[in-house]
A protein has these predicted regions:
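N-terminal leader/targeting and accessory segments in enzymes
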Residues: 1-99, 398
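Nucleotide phosphate-binding/pyrophosphate-handling subdomain across enzymes
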Residues: 2-9, 19-29, 277-384, 398
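Residues at the starts of beta-strands that form the adenosine-phosphate
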Residues: 9, 31-32, 138, 180-181, ...
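Residues in the short beta-alpha loop(s) of Rossmann-like NAD(P)-binding domains
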Residues: 16, 39-41, 145, 223-224, ...
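Phosphate-binding loop of NTP-binding sites
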Residues: 27-28, 66-69, 78-222, 226-239, ...
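Short internal beta-strands
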Residues: 31-40, 218-222, 362-363, 382-391
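Beta-strand->loop->alpha-helix junctions that form or flank phosphate-binding loops
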Residues: 37, 63, 98-102, 235-259, ...
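C-terminal helical cap/extension that packs against the catalytic core
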Residues: 49-50, 57, 373-423
Length: 423
């Protein structure tokens, strides 16, 4: 695939991190590349004209010209919707359109662990990388978290493992992408404005499995309603494993993880293994969803021979990632958490589920994003006060003030200061 790929020319749509990364990588390999972005220069944080000029990489900004159609392959930024005019035009010209992770995978000889899901993928990706690293393995964590996939390719060693966070946007434009191990953590309604409908969104996620073979592993969350219903009714590729809070999965899969008597158990029928790995009360990051993230990480790392001791020690120490139910500090008996990455109702749901009561919640969102029903249960039973901010503060007030005291604030700073006084 590498040799064939280097005989092609590439137009990269989008000058963000992954676009610049793949352009520079392909250029170093001798390919003909061109970057195009419709944004103005001041908005392009990763565009360094001096570097591009030095490396003889052509580019245009402020709009897409027809020059991009002179190239064999288009590598599309995840932010560009499939129904955008430029993509429609490319399709009409029968251009091959791929994502950065697809093209980067053509040049990756290391085994790839690919992780996707509506929620939890960053935490699980970083956690998986940390467990493997503590086992002494050479690990490159990249994708939707930190470095772009293409930025780690030159650093790969013979024994490296790539742990890749993948979004539905990236998976949508894959064709040959083939991870050694893949995990789908959950799939709930999100990004419908990009995909058009939930069916398209779900199918984009399942592209992670489409090229896997008997030597590969596919893992999914058996507790997630959509995963359980949809994956049970289709033929999946690779060695299929699952994780669940229900011990019954031992009878349904050859390998997996489950919770019983507050312990995560790992089982592999072929290897005659069924044993506890860790007590869930010893996991540093709290919440049912983080137990599920931990089970996914256990299954992914067991494939590479990681010991129970290393897994347990890592889970006891792992502090999570920034902005995802991140413990900030405790002041005068009040514990402060930052969950600003909770950008949909399902992620807010799992955050509220992690705390039993007496929650003071700073809440806000985009205008028109007013489907509060998903979190009503926990708001009414566990939250004692809401500080509403952003475009939806009035809608939050109207929806919840009858049940919970709601204070409308003009800024996040005001909400933090007022909530601090109330705590």
């Amino acid at each position: 695939m590498k040799k064939e790929a280097l005989n092609k020319s590439y137009a990269i749509l989008g000058a963000a991190r992954s676009g610049i990364g793949i352009a520079r990588f392909l250029k170093r390999k001798g390919a003909d590349v061109f970057i195009s972005d419709e944004s103005s220069e001041e908005k392009l944080l990763y565009l360094d004209k001096d570097i591009l000029d030095k490396e003889n990489i052509g580019y245009e900004i402020g709009g897409h010209s027809d020059k991009i159609f002179d190239y064999d392959i288009i590598i599309k930024s995840p932010g560009i919707k499939p129904d955008s005019e430029i993509i429609k035009k490319a399709v009409s010209k029968n251009k091959e359109i791929y994502s950065e992770i697809e093209v980067a995978s053509w040049f990756c000889d290391a085994p790839i662990i690919a992780i996707t899901g509506t929620n939890g993928k960053t935490t699980t990706t970083v956690l998986t990388g940390e467990i493997l690293s503590r086992q002494g393995l050479d690990v490159k964590v990249c994708g939707n978290v930190g470095l772009a996939f293409s930025e780690v390719l030159d650093d790969l060693k013979e024994n490296s493992i790539v742990v890749l966070e993948t979004s539905s946007f990236q998976l949508f434009n894959t064709k040959y992408f083939k991870p050694k191990a893949a995990a789908v953590l959950n799939v709930t309604v999100d990004h419908i404005d990009w995909h058009g409908n939930f069916e398209n969104y779900f199918e984009a996620k399942t592209n992670i499995n489409i090229n896997q073979t008997d030597e590969d592993y596919f893992i999914y969350n058996y507790d997630d309603p959509e995963c359980k219903a949809r994956f049970a009714g289709r033929t999946l590729n690779g060695n299929v494993c699952a994780f669940s809070y229900e011990p019954e999965i031992q009878t349904l899969f050859k390998a997996g993880a489950y919770v019983e008597k507050n312990k995560i158990n790992y089982f592999d029928i072929i290897k005659y293994i069924n044993a506890p790995v860790i007590d869930i009360r010893d996991i540093f990051i709290k919440g049912k969803h983080n137990v599920q993230n931990a089970m996914a990480a256990i299954l992914l790392t067991k494939i590479f021979g990681v010991t129970d001791e290393v897994i347990a020690d890592t889970l006891k120490d792992f502090k999570g990632v920034e902005h995802r139910i991140e413990f900030v500090r405790e002041i005068d008996g009040v514990r402060y958490y930052n969950d600003s990455k909770a950008t949909n109702y399902d992620s807010t749901y799992v955050a509220l589920e992690s705390f039993p009561s007496d929650i003071i919640l700073i809440m806000g969102g985009k205008k028109g994003d007013n489907n509060f029903a998903r979190v009503d249960e926990f708001i009414k039973s566990r939250v004692k006060k809401i500080f509403a901010i952003g475009q939806t503060r009035d809608a939050i007030y109207e929806h919840y003030n009858e049940f919970v005291k709601v204070v409308k604030c003009d800024s996040l700073e005001e909400a933090v200061n007022k909530s601090n006084k109330d705590s």
